[in-house]
């Protein structure tokens, strides 16, 4: 029984590290996918008020 404990503990430890790395990579991919949408929203927030002001100036 003692001879099996060390390899099983090592296997569990390596699997835990692997799972943690996979989670970090998946989170990074999700963040990369979310960024363009957030950038578009920021651009729209900056762009629309400027267009509104320009239209109001030309409309007068």
Swiss-Prot record:
Organism: Amolops mantzorum
GO terms, biological process: defense response
Entry's family note: Belongs to the frog skin active peptide (FSAP) family. Temporin subfamily.
Name the record gives this protein: Temporin-MT5
Entry keywords, A to Z: Amidation, Amphibian defense peptide, Antimicrobial, Cleavage on pair of basic residues, Secreted, Signal
Primary subcellular site in the record, as a coarse category: secreted
Pfam family, one: FSAP_sig_propep
Tissue expression profile of the protein: Expressed by the skin glands.
Segments crossing the lipid bilayer: none
InterPro entries: Frog_antimicrobial_propeptide
Recorded GO CC terms: extracellular region
Residues spanning the signal sequence: 1-22
Propeptide: 23-44
Summary of the function given for this chain in its UniProt record: Antimicrobial peptide.
Domain of life of the source: Eukaryota
Residues where Phenylalanine amide is found: 58
Compartment annotation: Secreted
């Amino acid at each position: 029984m003692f001879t099996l404990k060390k390899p099983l503990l090592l296997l569990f430890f390596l699997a835990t590290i692997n799972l943690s790395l996979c989670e970090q990579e998946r989170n990074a991919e999700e963040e990369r996918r979310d960024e363009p949408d957030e950038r578009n929203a920021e651009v729209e927030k900056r762009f629309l008020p400027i267009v509104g002001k320009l239209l109001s100036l030309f409309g007068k």
